[in-house]
A protein has these predicted regions:
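Small-residue-rich transmembrane alpha-helical segments that form helix-helix packing/gating elements
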Residues: 1-34, 38-157
């Protein structure tokens, strides 16, 4: 039973991240009537931006809530600017064009973002420092809940 409950906690954590991405797709489609195929690329781009902001400001050695909030604010601002540029350059000129044109533009924007990430950060995987968040662990009846899981669930709800 402990394994089942542990996997429920793990599933809720991952599912809440998927729900945030799906919410982004839904919001864009609701406003623009366009499936933004570059949305996932922007999510990945924001992770690389966050990692770079953390390394530049804190040197990968600071573990505090202030550091996490600072990285989040800087990352959100940078990705918001990129999102506005994407909308102005790739989507707005095609508002009156056929839907297929906007879909092709979204696919192209995704490719540009992917290749820009590979050009800037390289093709190899990058890993966030494990000390970014406190290593606090709560054990409740055999179920292990980490600080990161609590933070993900709290921010996504």
């Amino acid at each position: 039973m402990d394994i089942f409950l542990q996997q429920m906690v793990n599933g809720l954590t991952i599912g809440s991240l998927y729900a945030l991405v799906a919410l982004g797709y839904t919001m864009v489609y609701g406003v623009m009537r366009l499936i933004n195929f570059a949305h996932g690329d922007l999510v990945a781009f924001s992770a690389f931006i966050g990692l770079s902001v953390y390394a530049q400001i804190f040197g990968e050695s600071v573990t505090s809530l202030i550091a996490v909030i600072t990285v989040f604010i800087f990352t959100a601002a940078i990705v918001a600017v990129v999102g506005v540029l994407l909308e102005r350059l790739a989507y707005r000129p095609l508002r009156t064009a056929p839907r297929l044109s906007a879909v092709v533009s979204a696919l192209g924007a995704g490719l540009v973002i992917q290749n820009s990430v590979m050009l800037i950060w390289g093709p190899n995987m990058k890993i966030f420092p494990s000390n970014l968040f406190p290593a606090t662990i709560w054990e409740i009846g055999g179920i292990v809940i980490t600080f990161t899981q609590v933070m993900i669930l709290g921010l996504s709800s």
